[in-house]
Amino acid sequence: MISHTPKELASRLRSQFPHTPTQGQERLVHVFSKFSISEKPRCTLIIKGYAGTGKTTSIGAIVRTLREIRVSTVLLAPTGRAAKVMASYSGINASTIHRKIYVGAKRSDGSDVYKIAPNLFKKTTFIVDEASMIGESSGLVTNLLDDLLEYVFSGVDCRLVLVGDDAQLPPVGCSSSPALQESRLASMHSLTIATVELTEVVRQELDSSILANAHALRLDIENADSEGKTNFPKIDLSIGPDVVRLPGLELQDTLETLHGRYGEEGVI
């Protein structure tokens, strides 16, 4: 698929990071450089990591590297919002999974039916962000994860990168995120899989009160005793200005103001 050696690819990818890669990102550089030239069937790379560990930076670096060596790249996400975010940090267009992999048709009774579209891409790397949101139902009486895999690997020499945070809430009806379970994917779909988990918080991200507090809470959970007991989470408002204590009586007015300023999709 790629004429470059793993060493050359690693050097190119490393140079695309805006900072010195963390240990986890350095491992990703190593794994991705081998993943990209592997001749094994149905090559899949899972990149896991919670907020602040540099997933976005890493995917941006990967996309720029693939473009530099002229490898076709398709960016996908489960929702329109996630696709917009992905496009903004990668610099190229992104689509929802549904829009890319399904094609509509009409039944004889006039009702709509959807089927998997033909994958006409060749030697293309598909990168799917927010993969933890991908469940086993698409709302179209079909299995979204299965359909995604069938679509991608029906193309000629195509590869798949799944990016997500398995600490996020899993899809409705699932106890965990099926798209991030390496053993399950390998056994049920005959994939050749490598997994890289980013665990170190990028130093710049700790300047964010939101991420710093989330990181502290995660450490509390991980350090809970054998009975699962842990201290009630405490929010540190002194880290930075992006966390504000909001009295309950002010919540509705604040939400209305923010919705008016940024729109409903811009406020969580």
Q: Which residues are covered by each model-predicted region?
A:
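Walker B catalytic acidic pair
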Residues: 129-131
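Conserved helicase motor core of P-loop NTPases
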Residues: 4-9, 32, 40, 153, ...
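N-terminal pre-P-loop "Q-motif" helix
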Residues: 18-37
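Conserved lysine of the Walker
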Residues: 55
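Inter-Walker segment of RecA-like/P-loop motor cores
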Residues: 74-126
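Hydrophobic positions on the alpha1 helix immediately C-terminal to the Walker A/P-loop
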Residues: 58, 62
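The conserved Walker
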Residues: 51
